[in-house]
From Swiss-Prot:
The keyword Chloroplast does not apply. GO terms for molecular function: hormone activity. This is Precursor of CEP10. Keywords: Apoplast, Developmental protein, Hormone, Hydroxylation, Secreted, Signal. Residues 1-19 form the signal peptide. The modification Hydroxyproline is found at P70, P73, P95, P98, P102, P120, P123, P127. One of its GO terms (cellular component) is extracellular region. The gene is CEP10. Residues 20-66, 82-91, 107-116, 132 form a propeptide. The mature small signaling peptide is generated by proteolytic processing of the longer precursor. Interacts with CEP receptors (e.g. CEPR1 and CEPR2). Belongs to the C-terminally encoded plant signaling peptide (CEP) family. Extracellular signaling peptide that may regulate primary root growth rate and systemic nitrogen (N)-demand signaling.
Amino acid sequence: MKLFIIIVVTSLTISKVFDKTLVTIEARNLRKMDRHEHFNANEDFVEAKMLKKIDNKNNLNNRCINDFAPTNPGHNSGIGHPKVINNKFTKDFAPTNPGHSPGIGHLRVVNNKFTNDFAPTNPGNSPGIRHP
């Protein structure tokens, strides 16, 4: 018990000491935020790039398709090549009759009858537990 308390206190002390060290990052420097810029609802960012306005709206789906050049001739849809997104609204609501909705909360009853599905096998030919 005493060893456990020593280990816990030591690990907490080490975590407090190393919590004050410099934070290192890889790849690119992060943008310094002096004020609450990350709570600004008027701007949409994709890796700190301001998106183009289409129909006076900032929208992630409305970004320009030609922002990335393909690496090989042809139509690549791989890394760095955004898919073409159809921005049209489609009304896909399909009403159903009451009582015939197999969605959430509705159980689909197939058959309420009891069937005896026991099928006896010959001794030695049982593929159950502990049988190869």
